[in-house]
From Swiss-Prot:
Keywords: Alkaloid metabolism, Endoplasmic reticulum, Heme, Iron, Membrane, Metal-binding, Monooxygenase, Oxidoreductase, Transmembrane, Transmembrane helix. CDD domains: CYP71-like. GO terms for molecular function: heme binding; iron ion binding; tabersonine 16-hydroxylase activity. Residues 23-512 are cytoplasmic. It comes from Catharanthus roseus (Madagascar periwinkle). Induction: Not regulated by methyl jasmonate treatment. The keyword Secreted does not apply. Heme binds at residue 445. GO terms for cellular component: endoplasmic reticulum membrane. This is Tabersonine 16-hydroxylase 2. The gene is CYP71D351.
Amino acid sequence: MELYYFSTFAFLLFCFILAKTLKKSGQSNLKLPLGPPPIPILGNAHQLIGGHTHHILRDLAKKYGPLMHLKTGEVSTIVASSPEIAEEMFKTHDVLFADRPSNIVAFKILSYDYSDVVISPYGNYWRQLRKISMMELFSQRSVQSFRSIREEEVLNFIKSIGSREGTKINLSKEISLLIYGITTRAAFGEKNKNTEEFIRLLDQLTVAVAEPNIADMFPSINFLKLISRSKYKIEKIHKNFDAIVQTILNHHKDRLANHKSSSHEENGEQNKDLVDVLLNIQQRGDFDTPLGDRSVKAVIFNIFSAGTETSSTTVDWAMCEMIKNPTIMKKAQEEVRKVYNEEGNVNETKLHQLKYLKAVIKETLRLHPPVPLLLPRECREQCEIKGYTIPSKSRVIVNAWAIGRDPNYWIEPENFNPERFLESEVDFKGNSFEYLPFGGGRRICPGITFALANIELPLAQLLFHFDWKLASDETNIDKLDMTESRGVTVRREDDLCLIPFPYSASSLKGKY
């Protein structure tokens, strides 16, 4: 009897979804971009499984062109895979593509009902948060105010590695803990007992958000949201995350209310953490839309989910590529050691002199953008690109990974070659559409300066203080597995395990 009811329910649900899908087929009269033929109900969703989505979309683009149309369930999806198309979306029609989809389950949960700067809809509220991010949270002055935190945390990181010289260490894990530590102190003022749990929850969310959710394919069928396992999984993790952040928020509020933050009062702006900045803005109330606690927590989530993953993933990939390319490793080490040999240690004073290291970072971001498929956008109004119609409300995906490997713009695009950036004016500020590791247009990542500061110093220190060898079970660098993991951000699937050997001129040698 139970099987009968289940079968009947499944059949009725199938018919309902089919009817909804057919009802949405009114776009067939439009001149849509080319794409693979869809099948009933699923559309092209079945073609996006069994591999990394950014790889699959790149391969499909080779056949159907750099501007593609796909159907994922009832959702019309436009995929951009070339610099020319990206320029149309991020420059020519920037305003039309400045929105985010409002029908993705995970977005609603993680953004505290669209209260953050990353997911909130385009409009006055988003402009307000964008201004706060650019002018107060991630300005050059603000990022520089955290210099002592970065230098202290990285120095402790180097000492910890040095204490284990000649032994195998999991460098990927150590880098991740370092970046989280820096971000935690910048955001909250201190590390606390919940730091490890905080990291664990963010890692779980990164994986959970990347899992397919049928409710996202059929957003008009609200019933699917009620039975979505993915939704409840994300909600459960996020609830635990929220509890930690709320405790930290309450602590900051109590401290401000009781005037106990004497160090902040004595030293002015320089000692304020990011939560202090947000709470001060909240108290001033000088924005059109009040900044409530949900907005503050949503922005904190942005800082950790975007900032930490971008930096730690990039440092990890850079070390992987240099291990695989020892000539490049040697050049980078020689540069850092030449600049800092007299000091015996790296600080941020002379980082601007490390031209080759900056090229290594740029090349790493080209080959391994932390978010290979930029967060989806939504077309606000029907428009035309390259003679094709882009329907209103269609979901838009830009394949930054494919664009960074476009052979029409990059010589030997699959090779790791930092020299290509030494005399190049290509940058990641959104003006070079062949290079979009941080996105482009109005929605470009507001935390670029913060992320880069957390990449440059750790890399420079790792290169200065140590020579590196693969662990004994990974002696063949040509066979170093560069397979990517699955998730919104793309790390290396296997952690990088190396053996450090102290550099003779390091001022820390023998003092670990």
